[in-house]
Design a protein with these regions (language model features):
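Active-site microenvironment for binding and transforming phosphate-containing groups
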Residues: 2-285
Length: 285
């Protein structure tokens, strides 16, 4: 069973929720070739966590029991036919640090948060069989695939990371490390808080005005005296700036606040909740 979310941009471009069995669901983009890589955005259903993390909480740092989180990770990775013990994940800090992952990093953060890559909000690799994973509850996940150089990446873009242009910087890091051509890279902007729900104060709005001066009208709206920011479009614009072509950018158009029955939402769930995972891994040959 496949459920479509958001808008289809032609038959090639769509985002869907796919049932993996045992009430486990993953969101995926149609343009990411499964012959080259596996990718997934975990829904909140089908896990062992209890309230306030109820469901498939994939994060070790939110207060959930570590053994339950590990059980959730194993369950979801097994459904994806990936090895949970090989996953690499960072300690996310809403920064702009990007780390190249090698075989020396295998398993970092898989079972122990203290062992995760420190102070990092984006990962890239060209190593097959090495799943990259970041955790989210409203912030924007951006995934990357270079099918020519066989490299992948993933970035965590909250409002601070978006203003720091971490998505753009990840593209350029792939260019530096792997010789990727931005025109070859596919990018996907996953489920996250939408422009309908990301209410901000004047201080945050001003950061976006300063960072995106030509696009203020696109990114900031006001409704009944409340300012809202469009994180999806802000990240799409910086992917274009990095050299990715518009037709190679997919957007889930799925708001985690509106769809919090499917995805964890920090805002909708009152601040204490679990985290979904965004995962990407090159296939082994």
């Amino acid at each position: 069973m496949v459920n479509d979310f958001g808008d289809k941009r032609g038959e090639r471009m769509s985002f869907a929720l796919e049932h993996l069995g045992s009430n486990l669901w993953r969101g995926k983009f149609s343009s990411f070739d499964e012959k080259i890589c596996q990718h997934a955005f975990s829904a909140r259903l089908g896990g062992a966590s209890v309230k306030p993390y109820q469901g498939l909480n994939m994060a070790l740092h939110v207060g959930d029991e570590a053994d339950i989180v590990w059980q959730n990770r194993q369950r979801f990775f097994q459904a994806l036919e990936l090895k949970a013990e090989n996953l690499v994940t960072p300690q996310q800090v809403h920064g702009a640090n990007i780390q190249k992952v090698t075989l020396a990093d295998v398993g970092r953060g898989a079972k122990d948060y203290a062992d995760a890559i420190a102070d990092t909000d984006a990962l890239i690799t060209n190593e097959p069989g090495l799943p990259l994973m970041l955790c989210f509850a409203d912030c924007v996940p951006v995934i990357f695939l270079d099918p020519e150089k066989r490299a992948v990446g993933i970035a965590h873009a909250g409002w601070k990371g978006t203003v720091a242009k971490i998505a753009r910087e990840t593209v350029w890091k792939m260019q530096d490390e792997f010789g990727s051509e931005p025109a070859d890279i596919l990018a996907g902007i996953g489920p996250s808080i939408g422009p309908c729900c990301f209410a901000v104060g004047e201080e945050v709005a001003e950061k976006f005005r300063e960072t995106f001066p030509k696009f203020t009208d696109k990114l900031i709206t006001e409704q009944e005296g409340q300012l809202y920011v469009n994180l999806w479009e802000a990240n799409r614009l910086q992917l274009l700036e990095a050299g990715i072509s518009a037709e190679n950018i997919e957007m889930a158009d799925t708001c985690t606040d509106c769809q919090h029955q499917w995805f964890y939402s920090y805002r909708a769930d009152g601040g204490q909740t679990g985290r979904m995972a965004a995962i990407i891994a090159l296939n082994q040959y």
